[in-house]
Structures are given as C-alpha cells and as structure tokens.
C-alpha cells in the first residue's frame, strides 16, 4: 500500500489514544482527516481544535462526500461493533480498510523503528525514549499511548527516518511491526478475552521478540523467558541502575552500561516501575548511539504522561494523584510509589474497574492490590467494548477485599464522598471515564484545602 496515493484518511473510533496519534500524524503530513467516535472527550476536542472533522453519530450521511474509494484510507479500532453502519458502508464499497497496527506497520517499515512491548510500561517507556531521541536531535516521530506532558500530545516529533511505536499485544497487533530495536517490559497475563490463556499471551510475546533478529538489539527484564540484553535495578545485568536515592522528590542514580558508567542521572517519575521504564529507554537510546550527555539532559527534563502517576494537587496539606492503572500489577506499582514518597500517611484509593472480563479474570489480584490502601472507594465497572456479565459486579469484587475501610461509591456521589474523607493523599485509578472526572475532583479539592 502506497500512502502517497492517499488523500483522505477516515477513522472509525478516532477518539482512542492510539488512533488519535495517527490522526494527528496524517493531519501533519497534509492528508484530509475526519472520523467518527461514540462519545466526545478531551481528546476529540483537541483533534477538532486542530482542524479535524469529527462526528458522534453512526450515520453514513456524515461521511464526507469527497472521500472516494480510490483516494481514501479507512482506519478502524477492533472495539467497533460488527453492526456499525459506517463500517459496513466502507466494506460494501471496497475501501482500503486497515487496523491501526497495520497502518503503523506500513508507516514504520521504511524507517529505523523502535518498538516497545509489554503488558505494562509501554506508554511510559516509549514516551521517555521518544523524548530522549527528539531532544538529542534525531529525525524521529514517536506514536505513544498517552498525552506526554512535555508536548501536550501523543505524538512526539515530526521526523521521517526514525520511529518509536508502542507494540500493543491486544489482538496480536504488535506482530504487524518490523522493529530494528525493541524491548519487552513485562509479559503478565492480560487480554484473556482475546487470548484465552496466559500461555497464549506468552507465545505471542515470544513471536514478537523473534522479529528482532539481532538479540543485542532486544532489551528485556531479567525474569522474562526471552533471549536478549537484560536490564535490572540493583541486580547484575548488562544495563544496571544502582546507587539509587531520592533527592527533592526525584530519583538520582547511576547506570552501568557495556561501555561506561553514567553517573548521577536525575529522573522525576516516582516508583521503581518507572525507574525500570527509564532504564529500558536509556538502554535503547544508548544502543542507537545517542550521546550520554544528551540522554542525561533529556531524562532529567521528562515531565511524565497525563494519567500516569499524574500530580493534580501537590501541597503540604493535600496530594491528589491520578493514574491510568487497570491491572493488579499496575495498582501494586502505584501503591509502592505512594508509600515510598509518603510513608506513614493515610492514602485513599478511588478505583474504577475497566472491563467485565478483566475484572473477572483478575478479581483476586485486584482485591489484594486494592486492600493495601488505607481506604478504598470502588466505582461501578466501566464496560468499554463489553456487555455486562452475570455475577461480575463491583460489589462482587468488594466482597473479595480484606480492607475493612472499603465501600461502593456511585459516580454521582463521588465528589461528596471524597470531600468527606480525611485522607491527605488521594489517588484516582482506572482506564475508564474516571479520567473525565479528574478536573471536577481537582476543582472541588482545591476549593476545600
């Protein structure tokens, strides 16, 4: 497929975090871009402000009339239901229709491509790597699954010869990619609604890893059953972060590499999981040939990602953090970071489960990870692409938890319940529409400090 022959790009599901990055990219390179999404959001508002036409009704009459079959590419998300009328319109007329991952594969196949895979840490690692490469002057474009605070965008750079992409395991999407340098941050079970078993997920990651023929260009954590360059914190590895300390709320650490020791690197993202993500990005950038001083300067200036341990309020009296975590391992990482930064202080966690299937598959893990917090408010399950499942409810999950300070809180009661809590540390957690509530929670808390 030759993208140069495409004049128009139409997105079904344009408001998704990965889809919107592609929409920004095609808009930047001069294509006419428009699309459909089910609901308005902050992301769709930003796209509309950039000049992209978006509608929120499944209606073929709203498809631009000059989007002809010979000059239009249609990109869809797997979350689109089979009954979608616009989807059928394009299929029946033989339009070129591609998944997001297929298009990323087409864009990146003629570039020097970095791919970041893993059940957790993809967005943070790819964002740090994209930032390092961009700040060092590389001709890079990074497509990431979050809004990077330094750029207020999920697209970093406008380069033509180097790309950074998240290698998403959902729907085996990452098998469309052709990476020159890659990493795998983790291989925990997730997306069991797609894979069925954890063994099937592991097999898919192994197949992805096989795409990197030169194993000196594949970076892994020590516990993974893959052949590659090992990275670790305070353990023997090819790339080792050690002498880790906290100064003024930042990590300061050294990194041992095959060629040198990088001393006193500063990094502002809290939590050992983020330190590991940063180490992976450093290893990939170093292997690419990025100068040490450029890496050090860039990693110190990285401001994080929206909804990834994102500080909303940070004062002596009150701290409010928002995080996208939606898997027990990720919630454990949030808890570890909070306890490391605020030892001995009461922490309220507000969690909105994401997907009925994920809640079912990891219920015991969710119960254990959430019970670590001092107080827990559990919201209703956010369904996303799914229909309800019998017996899978937030009350069912709550009953599995051991923390006595826990309760179900309806969305309409959330502000009042948070206001009534005496916890000085508040964390909202989840991948659903809880993110849309963050501004109103922040406003209420600021008014009551």
Swiss-Prot record:
UniProt-listed InterPro entries: Mur-like_cat_sf, Mur_ligase_C, Mur_ligase_C_dom_sf, Mur_ligase_cen, Mur_ligase_N, MurCDEF_pg_biosynth, UDP-N-AcMur_Ala_ligase_MurC
Gene Ontology molecular function: ATP binding; UDP-N-acetylmuramate-L-alanine ligase activity
Ligand binding (ATP): 118-124
Record bears the keyword Nucleotide-binding: yes
Protein localization: Cytoplasm
Keywords: ATP-binding, Cell cycle, Cell division, Cell shape, Cell wall biogenesis/degradation, Cytoplasm, Ligase, Nucleotide-binding, Peptidoglycan synthesis
Enzyme superclass (EC): ligase
Domain of life: Bacteria
CC per GO annotation: cytoplasm
Presence of the UniProt keyword Cell division in the record: yes
One GO process term, biological-process aspect: cell wall organization
Main location: cytoplasm
Reaction catalysed by this enzyme: UDP-N-acetyl-alpha-D-muramate + L-alanine + ATP = UDP-N-acetyl-alpha-D-muramoyl-L-alanine + ADP + phosphate + H(+)
Enzyme nomenclature, EC number: 6.3.2.8
Pathway participation: Cell wall biogenesis; peptidoglycan biosynthesis
Family matches, as Gene3D superfamilies: Mur ligase, C-terminal domain, Mur-like, catalytic domain, NAD(P)-binding Rossmann-like Domain
Entry similarity comment: Belongs to the MurCDEF family.
Reported function: Cell wall formation.
Name of the protein this chain belongs to: UDP-N-acetylmuramate--L-alanine ligase
Organism: Flavobacterium johnsoniae (strain ATCC 17061 / DSM 2064 / JCM 8514 / BCRC 14874 / CCUG 350202 / NBRC 14942 / NCIMB 11054 / UW101) (Cytophaga johnsonae)
């Amino acid at each position: 497929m030759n993208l140069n022959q495409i004049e128009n790009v139409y997105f079904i599901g344009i408001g998704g975090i990965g889809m919107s990055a592609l929409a920004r990219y095609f808009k930047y390179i001069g294509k006419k871009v428009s699309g459909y999404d089910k609901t308005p959001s902050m992301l769709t508002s930003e796209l509309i402000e950039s000049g992209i036409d978006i509608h929120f009704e499944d209606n073929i009459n709203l498809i631009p009339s000059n989007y002809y079959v010979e000059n239009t590419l249609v990109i869809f998300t797997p979350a689109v239901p089979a009954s979608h009328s616009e989807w059928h319109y394009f299929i029946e007329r033989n339009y070129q229709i591609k998944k997001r991952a297929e298009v990323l594969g087409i864009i990146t196949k003629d570039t020097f491509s970095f791919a970041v895979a893993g059940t957790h840490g993809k967005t943070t690692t790819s964002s740090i790597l994209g930032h390092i490469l961009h700040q060092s002057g590389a001709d890079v474009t990074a497509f990431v699954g979050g809004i990077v605070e330094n750029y207020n965008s999920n697209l970093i750079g406008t380069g033509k010869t180097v790309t950074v992409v998240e290698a998403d395991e959902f729907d085996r999407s990452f098998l469309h990619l052709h990476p020159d340098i890659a990493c795998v941050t983790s291989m925990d079970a997730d997306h069991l609604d797609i894979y069925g078993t954890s063994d099937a997920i592991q097999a898919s990651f192994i197949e992805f890893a096989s795409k990197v023929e030169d194993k000196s260009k594949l970076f892994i954590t020590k516990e993974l059953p893959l052949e590659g360059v090992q990275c670790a914190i305070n353990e023997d590895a090819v790339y080792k972060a050690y002498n880790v300390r906290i100064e003024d709320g930042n990590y300061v650490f050294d990194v041992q590499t095959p060629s040198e020791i990088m001393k006193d690197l500063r990094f502002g993202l809290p939590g050992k999981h983020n330190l590991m993500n940063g180490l992976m990005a450093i290893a990939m950038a170093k292997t690419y040939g990025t100068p040490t001083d450029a890496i050090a300067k860039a990693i110190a200036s990285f401001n994080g990602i929206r909804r990834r341990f994102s500080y909303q309020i940070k004062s002596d009296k009150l701290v409010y953090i928002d995080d996208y975590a939606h898997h027990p391992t990720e919630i454990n990482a949030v808890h570890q970071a909070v306890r490391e930064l605020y030892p001995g202080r009461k922490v309220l966690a507000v969690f909105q489960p994401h997907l009925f299937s994920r809640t079912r598959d990891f219920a015991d893990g969710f119960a254990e990870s959430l019970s670590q917090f001092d107080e827990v408010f559990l919201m209703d399950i956010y369904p996303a692409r799914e229909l309800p499942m019998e017996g899978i409810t937030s009350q069912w999950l709550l009953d599995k938890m051991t923390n006595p300070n826990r309760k179900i809180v309806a969305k309409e009661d959330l502000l009042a319940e948070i206001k009534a809590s005496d916890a000085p540390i508040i964390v909202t957690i989840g991948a659903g529409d809880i993110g849309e509530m963050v501004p109103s929670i922040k406003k209420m808390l600021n008014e009551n400090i």
